[in-house]
Amino acid sequence: MRTAIIAGNWKMNKTVKEAVELVKELKPLVKDAKCDVVVCPTYVCLPAVLEEVKGSNIKVGAQNMHFEESGAYTGEIAPKMLEELGVHYVIIGHSERRQYFNETDETVNKKVKKAFEHNLIPIVCCGESLEEREGNITEKVLEGQIKVGLKELSKEQVEKLVIAYEPIWAIGTGKTATDEQANETIGYIRTVVKDMYGENVADKVRIQYGGSVKPGTIKAQMAKEEIDGALVGGASLKAEDFAAIINY
C-alpha cells in the first residue's frame, strides 16, 4: 500500500515572515493527516520554515537545486546546502523550470542522481502541453521525459522518489484534467517505470497529480487507483485550503 503524499509548491510567494505564519497556522490543522505532508517554500524561507515545523508531521522541500557540488553558478543552490539545512525533498523539473530556465530531461536526470547522493528525495515532474495533448502525443512525451529523467538509477532509488504528473495546460489555468484522464495518464507513467525497473518497483513509486488541485477536486482525484497524492500550487498558499486538501 502506497502512502499518499501531498506537497505544497509555494513558487515565488511568501516572505520569510509570511511563510512562518502559514506553517504555524497549518500545523494544528494537519496534525492528524493520514498522508505525508510537504511544504516547498523559496530558498530564503527554508531555515525559518524548517525551524517552525520541528516536532510536527510536516516535512520541507526545496523547489529546485543545481546538479553540481559547487562552482561559478551565480544564483544557484547546491544539493549539499539543502542537505545541511535538513531539507527532505526537492522538486526537480517543474514545468516552469523547463519553460523559463532551460531545464531539460538530461539536467533533470543529473539533478535526480545528485539529490540521492545528498539524502534528498526528488519529486520529479513530468507533463505535456495543450498542443501535445491535442496532437495525441501525450504518452510519447511522457515516455521520453521518464526514460531520460529516471535513467541509470538503482531500484532502491526509484522506489523512494516521487513523480508528479502535471499537465502543463492545467497549471494555473483553472483547467484540470478529468479524474479519468489523470488516473489513466498516471497509470501509463507507472507502466513506463515498470518497463524500466520492473513491476515491484513501479508498484512502490508514488505518483502525484499536479494541475490546479483544489479542496473541491481532491477527494475524487484521491479515490482513483493510480493517484497517490498531489503537488499543489496556489491552493497551498492558504492554510485552510491546503489543510482541506491534506485532510481529504
Swiss-Prot record:
Homodimer. It comes from Clostridium botulinum (strain Langeland / NCTC 10281 / Type F). This is Triosephosphate isomerase. The active site is at residues 94, 166. Involved in the gluconeogenesis. Catalyzes stereospecifically the conversion of dihydroxyacetone phosphate (DHAP) to D-glyceraldehyde-3-phosphate (G3P). Keywords: Cytoplasm, Gluconeogenesis, Glycolysis, Isomerase. Substrate binds at residues 9-11, 172, 212, 233-234. NCBIfam families: tim. Pfam families: TIM. HAMAP family: TIM_B. GO terms for cellular component: cytosol. The keyword Isomerase applies. Pathway: Carbohydrate biosynthesis; gluconeogenesis; Carbohydrate degradation; glycolysis; D-glyceraldehyde 3-phosphate from glycerone phosphate: step 1/1. The lineage of its organism: Bacteria, Bacillati, Bacillota, Clostridia, Eubacteriales.
